[in-house]
């Protein structure tokens, strides 16, 4: 049975934190000219109480925080949101749901430390995962903000609704197999055995944010007809939450919440509330942090020159994103449905130059395009093992790229690559507008391709998300290639079998693959869905071997072209706030501003 704690020693966790920081070359803090410490607030677009580390201290001006009770203050923690607060809606299945503020207003079922892949309790205190049945225990002491106690019925309700709605959990649990044992226990029947990491990561995005009184009609509709018309259109201006902060109001420029005294971790929170100021651009958030108008920001890309303008009271917390820029190919396109064309693109792009251009402090190039995250600390190599040397690294080579295009029937005319019918090989690279690092990186990609003779353009788009997920109007586009989780199943499933692969990339459901390490060997047909289903249930050496086989498929077929990985940058000020030191791994949970108060590791200093 998985318990509240994982048994990892604090020294081991500090080593993990140091290894992560060393891998990105960040000291953990950068300096500024001093003020911060206002009571203004603001956010941006997946446990049990952790004990303090051996070198934690309290008192005076120390910024280190323990879980001991602290004096209550009237401070409000200010952070930022890029969403207009008065337009926010608190229906998690609809539009304009404030996913970052929701981390304070609602309680997740569990939390994940992404530096150590450690699962920690939220609403769930314990879990026992068998081959056929999962038993979940609900932590005592949670209440809806309307006053009712949270029970296993509430958790079962949420899980059934999410499964019907197609959440990741629906791949391994049917809604009729969710049952309540008693007020604090529920059981889930599994469709097939799954690895513990696969099951728990499937719970990671789920928060207790659907009070049955508001959503019962939709679960009833699902159970009666298999559909719930109106679920995505339902509006909720005021949430009935379960988190440590309760909604007060949402106005044009701010969302305000107050400390909720009936939360089980309320004794660890010694400040009056949180506020999110509407700051819709990176530049406005940088200015607010520098001027002390906010006390922290959950995640904002910050170039070195901006970070160096900050003072000693602004602390950076690098967060492993397990995510980064890749190229989505539309596999219904006449050119980008061809394996050799995709491979040629991967050869042309200088990934090291790309990472430097995007911001070398927070980006690293993908070393081996195989669908596995972990390029910051080389953890992907642990999964590939001795097979690593067999994979194609796609080191920049215009000669190899040219040979591949020629094999695919392309030729160069007046310096531009054209197909056998004379059609120009174009690369209209669509990216989300306003993403500074991707804009800079995209320019590097386009430059490489144009110099090679592919007609490339960079197209930042305000309608990006609608174009990609709605109209699917794209030829090539930039989007994250990994799934945001270090465990390899999730990124491999995303690339080869999941919704992205099927619905957006239009990647085929079966592929011809040569033996691992023999790219010119005789191919065999591989059906992708059963392969990913098998991987989900494997552990140990069997999981490692299957991971290598599927990573080889990504390496050869490139459903997306993995280019780089990034580190997210989270920020806290320390003039009015006590928080963790850079040695404390407990900050590496999405996101520190919302998780650390639960642990008593982000507290207000006496006024």
Features from the language model and the residues they span:
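Extracytoplasmic/peripheral linker and loop segments enriched in polar/acidic and small residues
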Residues: 21, 70, 127, 132, ...
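Surface-exposed binding/hinge segments that line
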Residues: 171-224
């Amino acid at each position: 049975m998985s318990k509240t704690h994982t048994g990892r020693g604090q020294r081991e966790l500090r080593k993990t934190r140091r290894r992560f920081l060393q891998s990105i070359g960040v000291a953990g803090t950068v300096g500024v000219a001093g003020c911060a410490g206002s009571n203004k607030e603001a956010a941006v677009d997946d446990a049990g109480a952790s004990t303090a580390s051996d070198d934690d201290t309290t008192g005076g001006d120390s910024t280190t925080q323990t879980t001991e009770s602290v004096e209550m203050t009237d401070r409000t923690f200010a952070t930022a949101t890029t969403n207009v607060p008065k337009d926010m809606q608190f229906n998690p299945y609809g539009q304009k749901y404030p996913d970052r503020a929701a981390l304070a207003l609602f309680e997740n079922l569990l939390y994940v430390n992404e530096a150590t892949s450690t699962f920690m309790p939220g609403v769930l205190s314990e879990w026992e995962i068998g081959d056929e049945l999962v038993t979940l225990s609900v932590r005592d002491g949670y209440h809806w903000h309307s006053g009712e106690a949270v029970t296993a019925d509430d958790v079962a309700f949420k899980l059934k609704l999410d499964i019907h709605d197609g959440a990741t959990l629906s791949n391994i649990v049917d809604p009729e197999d969710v049952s309540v044992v008693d007020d604090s226990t529920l059981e889930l029947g599994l469709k097939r055995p799954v690895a513990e990491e696969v099951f728990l990561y499937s719970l990671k995005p789920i928060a207790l944010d659907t009070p049955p009184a508001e959503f019962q009609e939709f679960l009833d509709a699902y159970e009666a007809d298999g559909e719930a018309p109106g679920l995505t259109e339902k509006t909720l201006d005021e949430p009935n939450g379960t988190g440590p902060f309760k909604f007060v109001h949402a106005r044009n420029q701010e969302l305000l919440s107050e400390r909720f005294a009936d939360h089980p971790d309320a004794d660890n929170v010694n400040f009056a509330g949180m506020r999110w100021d509407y700051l819709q651009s990176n530049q406005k958030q940088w200015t607010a942090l520098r001027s002390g108008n906010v006390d922290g920001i959950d995640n904002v890309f910050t170039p070195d020159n901006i970070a160096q303008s900050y003072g000693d009271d602004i602390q950076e917390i690098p967060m492993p994103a397990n995510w980064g820029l890749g190229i989505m190919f539309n596999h219904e396109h006449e050119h980008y449905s061809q394996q050799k064309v995709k491979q040629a693109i991967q050869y042309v792009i200088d990934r090291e130059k790309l990472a430097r251009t995007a911001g070398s402090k927070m980006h690293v190039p993908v070393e081996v395009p195989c669908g596995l995250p972990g390029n910051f600390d080389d953890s992907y190599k642990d999964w590939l093992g001795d097979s690593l040397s067999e994979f194609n690294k796609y080191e920049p080579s215009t000669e190899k790229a040219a040979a591949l295009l020629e094999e695919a029937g392309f030729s160069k005319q007046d310096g531009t690559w054209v197909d056998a019918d004379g059609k120009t090989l174009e690369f209209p690279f669509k990216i989300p507008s306003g993403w500074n690092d991707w804009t800079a990186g995209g320019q590097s990609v386009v430059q490489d391709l144009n110099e090679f003779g592919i007609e490339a353009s960079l197209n930042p788009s305000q309608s990006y998300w609608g174009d990609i997920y709605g109209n699917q109007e794209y030829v090539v586009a930039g989007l994250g290639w990994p799934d945001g989780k270090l465990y390899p199943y999730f990124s491999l499933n995303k690339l080869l079998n999941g919704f992205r692969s099927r619905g957006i990339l239009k990647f085929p459901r079966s592929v011809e693959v040569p033996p691992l390490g023999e790219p010119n060997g005789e191919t065999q047909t591989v059906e992708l869905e059963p392969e990913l289903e098998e991987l989900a249930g494997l552990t140990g050496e069997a999981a490692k071997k299957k991971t290598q086989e599927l990573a080889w498929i990504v390496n050869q077929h490139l459903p997306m072209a993995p280019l780089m990985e990034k580190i997210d940058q989270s920020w806290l000020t320390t003039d009015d706030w006590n928080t963790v030191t850079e040695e404390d791994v407990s900050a590496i949970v999405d996101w520190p501003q919302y998780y650390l108060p639960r642990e008593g590791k982000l507290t207000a200093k006496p006024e």
